[in-house]
C-alpha cells in the first residue's frame, strides 16, 4: 500500500526468481524489433528471450520480463499460422498477469485517491513505463475495477 509515498514493488530480481522457480529459462538474444519474446515447446517448457542491448531502463526490463513471464504462467501463446487463434487475447492475458504483479489494483486505487493522477507520475511510482501504466489502467477499466475516464494523459 501507499504509505508516505513508498510502496513495496515487485523487484526485478523477484521476476527472475519467478521464472527460475517455474523452470522458465531466460536467454539473452538479438531482438531489435520486439526486445523480448517467449515460447513454449511441445513438452511444455517455456523460454524467454530478452535483448539487453535494446532495453534502456530497469522499468523497461521489468515490463518486458513480467509480460513474457505472464505468457508462460498463463499458457497464453498463439499460433502465428492459425486462422482461428486471436493474438490480442493472449497478449491481454500476459498483460493482466504482469499488471497484477507490477501495478496491483488496490495500490493503484490508493495512489489515485492520494492524488497521484498523471500517467508519468504513476509510472514513476510503480517503476514501469508510461505505456505499460496506461495498459494496466485500461485492464482495470475493462475489469470494472476502475471507472472510465480513469486518467487524463
Whereabouts are the PLM-identified features?
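Active-site hotspot residues in diverse enzymes, especially metal/ion-binding acidic/histidine motifs
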Residues: 1-153
Amino acid at each position: 500500500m501507499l504509505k508516505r509515498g513508498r510502496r513495496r514493488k515487485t523487484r526485478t530480481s523477484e521476476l527472475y526468481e519467478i521464472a527460475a522457480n517455474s523452470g522458465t529459462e531466460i536467454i539473452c538474444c538479438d531482438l531489435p524489433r520486439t526486445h523480448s519474446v517467449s515460447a513454449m515447446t511441445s513438452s511444455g517448457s517455456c523460454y524467454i528471450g530478452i535483448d539487453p542491448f535494446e532495453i534502456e531502463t530497469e522499468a523497461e526490463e521489468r515490463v518486458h520480463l513480467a509480460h513474457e513471464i505472464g505468457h508462460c504462467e498463463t499458457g497464453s501463446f498463439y499460433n502465428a499460422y492459425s486462422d482461428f487463434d486471436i493474438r490480442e487475447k493472449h497478449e491481454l492475458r500476459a498483460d493482466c498477469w504482469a499488471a497484477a504483479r507490477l501495478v496491483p489494483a488496490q495500490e493503484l486505487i490508493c495512489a489515485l485517491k492520494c492524488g497521484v493522477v498523471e500517467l508519468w507520475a504513476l509510472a514513476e511510482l510503480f517503476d514501469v513505463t508510461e505505456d505499460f501504466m496506461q495498459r494496466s489502467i485500461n485492464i482495470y477499466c475493462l475489469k470494472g475495477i476502475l471507472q472510465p475516464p480513469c486518467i487524463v494523459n
